[in-house]
């Protein structure tokens, strides 16, 4: 069966094009996370979905964590194929790392929760919807007040259920659904375990305040040479594309235009080749030769 432990399951955004390009994709992925939890014998301590990569801190055997990975990749690929019949989903390559000491575990949890902040998407962790960030060390009464008006799974008619969740599998009837339409992570994330690991809100705040991105990225062999967050660089690229070519959808640029745009982004913002390639949808190896 294998020994259970804490694992960091992650994908590298520098190896992946955009995974979740709009709110519908994020909502679908959030519901898939909840479904994978039900299907696998893992405990989810923390997770975040970014537009081009994901992170999960899981407790289970390595085999159970890999099953979780495989189900997530399969389910999201199916959803993407149905939503975009003529396009292929970006390849989602997961790596897995055993977490072998307590301090690294606490740093890793904080790193995952901080991901939205580090990418420039939110001012604090609980502002970033597509994660477990808003669950930890919350006053129970306020948490209950927040979710008490939300629908539960039992409120959803069977005809709407399949359309909403893209599955015949049933979620527990008392699970809450957010106003955005995804299963609330508080239903399945083991945030109480996380609180017991940190022991106090002071300790949690301390670790959240530690800028460990470079240290964690190096331990995961992730390249973090980024001059601007993806969101900001993408906005700059769109504005530059509109100015140069009158085009705001970067996918509509031809190869020559993308190369020229990439050169301008490199000159103006000194971003890495991999980041620019991801933003303008070009093979980084091809772009590197040209830049």
Segment roles from a protein language model:
Residues 52-60:
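Short beta-strand->loop micro-motif that forms the acidic, two-metal-ion catalytic signature
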Residues 1-46, 61-291:
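Short Pro-Cys-Gly-centered "Cys-loop" motif that presents a nucleophilic cysteine in a tight turn
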């Amino acid at each position: 069966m294998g020994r259970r432990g804490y694992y960091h399951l992650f994908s590298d955004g520098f190896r992946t094009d955009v995974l979740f390009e709009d709110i519908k994709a994020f909502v679908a992925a959030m519901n898939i996370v909840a479904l994978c939890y039900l299907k696998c014998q893992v405990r989810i301590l923390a997770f975040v979905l970014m537009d081009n990569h994901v992170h999960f801190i899981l407790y289970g055997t390595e085999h159970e964590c890999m099953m979780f990975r495989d189900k997530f990749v399969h389910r999201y690929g199916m959803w993407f194929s149905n939503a975009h019949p003529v396009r292929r989903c970006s390849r989602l390559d997961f790596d897995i790392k055993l977490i072998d000491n307590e301090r690294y575990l606490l740093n890793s949890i904080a790193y995952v929760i901080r991901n939205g902040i580090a990418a420039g998407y939110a001012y604090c962790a609980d502002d970033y919807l597509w994660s477990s960030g808003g669950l930890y060390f919350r006053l129970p009464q306020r948490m209950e007040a927040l979710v008490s008006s939300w629908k539960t799974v039992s409120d959803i008619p069977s005809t709407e259920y399949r359309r909403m969740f893209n599955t015949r599998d049933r979620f527990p009837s008392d699970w809450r659904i957010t106003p955005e339409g995804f299963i609330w992570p508080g239903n399945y994330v083991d945030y109480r375990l996380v609180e017991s690991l940190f022991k106090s809100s002071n300790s949690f705040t301390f670790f959240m305040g530690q800028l460990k991105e470079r240290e964690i990225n190096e331990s995961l062999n992730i390249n973090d040479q980024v001059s601007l967050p993806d969101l900001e660089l993408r906005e700059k690229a769109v504005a530059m594309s509109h100015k140069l070519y009158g085009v705001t959808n970067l996918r509509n640029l031809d190869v020559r235009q993308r190369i020229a745009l990439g050169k301008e982004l490199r000159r103006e913002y000194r971003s890495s080749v991999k980041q620019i390639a991801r933003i303008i949808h070009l093979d980084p190896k091809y772009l590197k030769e040209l830049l």
